[in-house]
Amino acid sequence: MENSGLLALPLNAATIVPEGAILLALLSSLLVDLAGEKTASRWVPPICYAGLGSALILLASQWNSTLSPSFLGAFLADNLAIAFRAIIATSTLFSLMISWRYVERSGAPMGEYAAILLAATLGAMFLCGSTDLVSIFVSLETLSVSSYLLAGYMKQDARSSEAALKYLLVGSATAAVFLYGASLLYGLTGGSTNLDAVALALQSSDTPVAALALVFVLATVAFKIAAVPFHQWTPDVYEGAPTPIVAFLSVGSKTAGFALALRLLVGCFESFDIQWKFLFSLLAILSMVLGNIVALSQTSMKRMLAYSSIGQAGFVMIGLVCGTEDGFAAMILYLATYLFMNMGAFACVILFSIRTGSDLIADYAGLYQKDPLVTIGLSLCLLSLGGIPPMLGFFGKIYLFFAGWADHQYLLVVTGLITSVVSIYYYISVIRMMVVIEPKEASDVVKSYAAVNWNIPGLNPLRVALLVCVIVTGIGGIFSNPLFQWANSAVAGTPILQKVIVTALGTTGTIS
């Protein structure tokens, strides 16, 4: 009877047409790559742009559409899934634009590289709308395995291979932990993997088994978003992996992790609301404090941005813990703003690395004299990450802090404010080094800085990505209110979030 009920559900394949466009670009990239590197370098970029651009247009056309489960109840294209999938697709688009020159210099096959990155994108996008434990695991592993391959893609670099091995070992352990937690949830439901059935079973189950399943699920989510103490892989992987891949992991993979948190923790563990929010609050505080304090002592730009991303995850977790409409909306808004400011920062780091081969913060000394564009772009993105007004990041943080304060999350908000000040210190230290130091005090690397030449193949897409990210980061604060309304619309069009919000309002009304 259960099988006949499942078969009665529609496939509704139209909901994953955006992913279909990306899959078509993936297969086309592999086919073009067979024709030789010269042909691939000419055709792979436009193929990827067409696939990702089509996916974004198709996602926009699905906004506020009628909700119906897809693939026997394993996927749901609600507004939450659409918003997160759009952020991930955009992060991949920027990652590819800042990748081409980097890949050409390394001599790696361009079509193969693009195909693996698009595969990771597919895994992340499917994860955002998965409503079944099996589809969640398959999506999670698609994202993870592709990420392992990308982290170790520069085989001639020992640090890249080391990063891939560490990422693989920790990621494999996390996959085992999730599988064990999923098996416990499967047992509690009496044999169903659908998240609605899991949520229903957990409402009437306060057993230690359910609590253990919560711990395993929370550990999986914490690993994907690089929250303390599940962050150990992050600095080493960020430092050793190719920089464009680090940019994708810091935005695309993290966004998928927060989508997973909303689907599982908010959607399924409503009866354990107090417990998981307490644990997540603890992780948020640890992430904000450790991420920003350890970043102070870093000498590598990529390691500094790695610890910065740990702290940024802590800020986003404030919105998740709130469990209110404003909290969820602020969380989505901040992830969208983080996309532009972080991608802009990594674009500048890649440009500097291409021209100097260095990743040391000290080597940025006096850069303004030789490369004003990289200096101004990196400065604006770092100021935005620090939450300096009127940058886009300031409005993202202020919405998060307002939502936290309104929900009486005073400790989280105060911790966020203090650690934001700490982050401003190390961001401004980099800016001061680039701008204030006299030409005679510039680093040896900057003194021998190569002349800026944008006619080199692969640099023009990087420049476009850099300019777009910097412009949006610099003046995007003007449009923060429409962005917040978009985020509110995403929350309003997501049934699992509305259910939690209504329940919270009812509880508040009862208490008052």
Swiss-Prot record:
PANTHER family: NADH DEHYDROGENASE. GO terms for cellular component: organellar chromatophore thylakoid membrane; plasma membrane; plastid. The chain crosses the membrane at residues 6-26, 43-63, 80-100, 107-127, 133-153, 168-188, 210-230, 242-262, 276-296, 304-324, 332-352, 376-396, 411-431, 464-484. It comes from the Eukaryota. It is a multi-pass membrane protein. GO terms for molecular function: NADH dehydrogenase (ubiquinone) activity; NADH:ubiquinone reductase (non-electrogenic) activity; quinone binding. Its EC number is 7.1.1.-. The keyword Membrane applies. Keywords: Membrane, NAD, NADP, Organellar chromatophore, Plastid, Plastoquinone, Quinone, Thylakoid, Translocase, Transmembrane, Transmembrane helix. The keyword Transmembrane helix applies. This is NAD(P)H-quinone oxidoreductase subunit 2, organellar chromatophore. NDH-1 can be composed of about 15 different subunits; different subcomplexes with different compositions have been identified which probably have different functions. GO terms for biological process: ATP synthesis coupled electron transport. It is found in: Plastid, Organellar chromatophore thylakoid membrane. Pfam families: Proton_antipo_M. NDH-1 shuttles electrons from an unknown electron donor, via FMN and iron-sulfur (Fe-S) centers, to quinones in the respiratory and/or the photosynthetic chain. The immediate electron acceptor for the enzyme in this species is believed to be plastoquinone. Couples the redox reaction to proton translocation, and thus conserves the redox energy in a proton gradient. Cyanobacterial NDH-1 also plays a role in inorganic carbon-concentration. Belongs to the complex I subunit 2 family.
